[in-house]
Structures are given as C-alpha cells and as structure tokens.
Amino acid sequence: MFRLPIVKFFNRIFNRVTITVVLVALQVLWLLWAFWSFTAGRVWLNGALKALSILIVLYLVRKDENSAYKICWIVLIGLLPLLGGALYLAFGNKAPAKHLRERMQKVEQAHQTELAQPEGQTDALDISSRNLSRYVAKFGPYPAWRDTAAHYFSCGEEMYPQLLADLDKAEKFIFLEFFILRSGKMWDGVEQILRRKAAQGVDVRLIYDDFGSLLGLPSDFVIRMERAHIRCIPFNPVVPLVSLVMNHRDHRKIVVVDGNVAYTGGVNLADEYINAEQRFGYWKDAAIRLEGAAVWNFTVMFLNVWNAFRPQETDYTAFAPTRLPAVQDGVVQPYADSPLDEEPLAETVYLDILSQAQRYVYIYTPYLAVGCLLYTSPSPR
C-alpha cells in the first residue's frame, strides 16, 4: 500500500533537474578545490594568473563589446584576481558551441535565396522606414512583405481560442517552436489537436527548448510525441556539465499552419500565459497572428533550425503560402536574431525606432532588461 507514494517520492527527488543541479554543483566544487590546491604555495603561478587577469581587463576595456557585459567580467576579475582571468578564458566566449554554430550556418547559407527581397514591397514606405527595412533584409536576411493581414492579441487568453481554431483547420503541416512547454490546460488543448491532425496525415513538427521546458514535461515526452507521429526536437539538450554552451537557448515562439497563418509574440505554451494558473500574479504577454505572404519568413526560420538537427528538406517551396488575405495591413517584416554573427540586429531595430520617434513609443513587455545603448538612445524627449 506504500509502494505508490514511495515511487512518487523517488521520482520527485531523482528527476532530471535534481540530478543535473547536484552533478553541476559537485563539478563546480571539485574545480574550485583543484584550482586552489594547484595554486597553493606556487608564488610564480599566482603572479602569472594575476598578470593574466590584468591583461584580460585591459583587453575588455578596449574591446568593442556590450558595456554591461564587460563591466560584469571586470568586477568578477577584480573580486577574484587569481581565478577571474581563467574563468574568462573558459566561459567568456559568447559564441555558440562550434558544432551548433556550424550546423546553423550551413543551413542558413544554403537557403539564403529563399529569403530574397521581392521588388516593390517597400515602395510605399517613407525613407526612414525603407532604410530600416533594407537593413533587416540585408543582415537578417528577412524580406518585407505586403499582402499580409496582422491581428494583435493583448494577452494569451485572447490568442488561445484563435490558435486552437487555426490548428484545427490545418490540412498540410503544422510547425511549432517554443521556449517553454508545460503540461496543463494550454498544452493539453494544443496536444489533442496535434495528435488528431498527425493521425490524419498532417505533417506535425515541434521544436522546444530543453532548458525552458525542463520542469514542465515528462522524461519520456519525445518518445510520446514520436509515437503519435509528431516529430520532435529538444533544442540544445541540457547535460549535467559545467558549460556556458548551456546558456544558448531558443527563446522563439512560432506557430505556422499550412504556410498561410503564423503566430509569434511572447506567449509560451504554459498555463500562466493564458492565466489558467497564476504563478506570478496576472501574466500579461502579447501575441500576433499573421496571415499571408509574410508567414514565409516564419516558415524559413523554423525549417532552418529543423534542418540543422534533422536534415530533411533541400527545397522549401512546398511550404510557401498558398492563400493571401482579403484585407492587408501595410508592410510586414518578421525577422529573427541569433548569436551566430556579431550583428546586433534586434537591438539596432529598437534603437532606430526610438531615434526616429517624433511623438511616442509604446513598449510592452513583462521583462524589461534595457542595455546601455537603449538607455542612451538619442530619441526625442
């Protein structure tokens, strides 16, 4: 009679999160012990490490880098002059792991032609907007589109019923890419439709961030999805090793249905995003539904990540939009940013919006983490 509670207790204690945290903590303690043991009594080594720290601080001062990032490292090195320089050499590189970077770059380079900017799409824009659009098309590279309808949802519970309705209408494919998946009302509603559509022969694919979803999904989640013919990729799986590579996460929220409808915004597939559960009080995050030509950008974004890990398509045209909306809402240009290059695309877009604003700028986000450049932006006051 005590067997089931005991099993549940052990499952809670010895889960992926607990094991990962314990193993990483043990590694950190061992590395610290090894470092201090190796340097104890070795005056020449202590001097060399301090000199290394000084050189790295000078390097950071001169480096063209985000000021907040540099200051954090300089303060850490100042507090730990022996260890700080070595830590920077080990963990200071913000670039993704080599294998991840090479995979992504290979796929993106192979499909750059899929994102060529069609002529005439931005002719109606003013000069400043056209210049910004050209910048995004060049460095994204993501083109701008007319023939697109856009609908704004001010919170997740407004978006959710429409999302379910669009998923239920899928005939060819459904692509989903999210940072957080968590079992509950929201995900259960989506999963039921995905399972039914997959059984009907619809191509259903799911990418989720393994770290973001670590606490919310069962350990056999991928197996369950694959058995239901829902192909699944956990992005950058969490491993119990001390590594900055684990910091590179997939924060995107994308849904594409038949190439004609797309969703994006800040809403993940977890109950707090539709306020079915209030973990942090009322949660207010926005979402956008697009229908028409601009959906193509989201389709390519998804397929590039998918083919980096499960190479499949060499030709994306089978996933192109087939239906244009009756009502159009100006020019729409979805874009993505990543650490694969040194171009701060998203930050530059926000800086341009702030600098060009004449009357007001509305910023709506649950997470306000403003960098130095945004604080000092020369926008009109």
Regions found by a protein language model. Give the residues of each.
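N-terminal localization/anchoring segments of enzymes in phospholipid and broader phosphate metabolism
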Residues: M1-D352, Q356, R381
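NAD(P)-dependent dehydrogenases' Rossmann-like dinucleotide-binding region
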Residues: Y364-L368
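Binding-cleft/active-site segments that stabilize strongly anionic ligands or cofactors
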Residues: V370-L374
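Conserved small/polar residues in nucleotide/adenosyl-binding loops
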Residues: Y375-R381
